[in-house]
């Protein structure tokens, strides 16, 4: 089981409650938002929407009150739509010492094998990278069974190539409604759940995307903020142990 770790050994000292998005904040303020208490490992996820990144400035956030250690980057969407900032930013993330990961935005009506193969062609993962991520946010008017089958097809094909179970990203409500089948419990789970003090999902989870309006020095636009549900050592254990060579 992943454990929620404390910052150092002490509980998070909460700031006085203040209004955040018309709701009281009971945590501490950081990056312009209400930050969850008691997580030591923070991260962001980015795509071309974030614009040009000042990587030198971004590294200073590793020394911040809420240190940013990992970055997920959008690589692909559907069967043929790549993110045009991915290659450069993925290289820069490693060069500047971040733990990096790559994600695919799933289009349910596009053939899942085609989507998996497109991701595989685009993303070369190295030792120390996080497992590949599948981002599922819509049903694309597919039936629940069609959606489950398509998602499982992508996960299986990508796992066969990289030799590691992919991370599954969904919102709290989407997971409960469409992907609650126990077959998906085998995959590390990255949950999107905004404007709540804590994760209400009862199952095991690894990452929590807690806001989409973070303000991070080095990034011009607002950015998604995440926490890892564990220690730095546990995050490193999740990373790839060997480079992914063509199989």
Where would I find each of the regions flagged by the language model?
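Single conserved hydrophobic/aromatic residue that forms the stacking wall/gate
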Residues: 1-8, 12-15
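Structural motif
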Residues: 3-4, 36, 63, 199
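Short, structured coil segments at secondary-structure junctions
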Residues: 7-8, 96, 185, 203
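Hydrophobic single-pass membrane-insertion segments
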Residues: 14-24
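Substrate-binding cleft of extracellular glycoside hydrolase catalytic domains
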Residues: 24-31, 35-155, 159-161
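Functionally critical loop-and-helix segments that line ligand-binding/catalytic clefts
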Residues: 26-50, 56, 180, 184-247
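Flexible, glycine-rich phosphate/dinucleotide-binding loops
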Residues: 80, 109, 175, 198, ...
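Catalytic domains of cell-wall/extracellular-matrix polysaccharide-remodeling enzymes
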Residues: 130-202
């Amino acid at each position: 089981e992943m454990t929620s770790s404390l910052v150092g050994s002490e509980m998070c000292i909460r700031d006085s409650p203040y209004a955040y998005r018309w709701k009281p904040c009971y945590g501490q303020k950081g990056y312009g938002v209400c930050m969850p208490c008691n997580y030591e490992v923070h991260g962001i996820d980015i795509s071309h929407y974030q614009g040009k990144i000042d990587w030198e400035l971004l590294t200073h956030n590793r020394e911040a009150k809420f240190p940013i250690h990992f970055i997920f980057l959008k690589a692909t969407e559907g069967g043929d739509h790549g993110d045009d900032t991915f290659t450069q930013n993925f290289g820069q993330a490693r060069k500047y010492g971040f733990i990096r990961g790559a994600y695919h935005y799933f289009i349910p009506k596009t053939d899942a094998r085609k989507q998996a193969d497109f991701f595989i062609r685009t993303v070369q993962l190295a030792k120390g990278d996080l497992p590949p991520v599948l981002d599922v946010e819509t049903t694309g008017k597919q039936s629940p069974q069609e959606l489950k089958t398509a998602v499982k097809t992508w996960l299986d094909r990508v796992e066969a190539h990289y030799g590691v179970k992919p991370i599954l990203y969904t919102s709290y409500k989407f997971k409960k409604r469409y992907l609650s089948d126990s077959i998906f419990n085998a995959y590390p789970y990255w949950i999107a759940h905004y404007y709540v003090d804590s994760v209400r999902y009862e199952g095991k989870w690894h990452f929590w995307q807690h806001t989409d309006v973070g303000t991070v020095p080095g990034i011009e636009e607002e950015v998604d903020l995440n926490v890892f549900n564990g220690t730095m050592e546990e995050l490193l254990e999740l990373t790839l142990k060997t480079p992914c060579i063509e199989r």
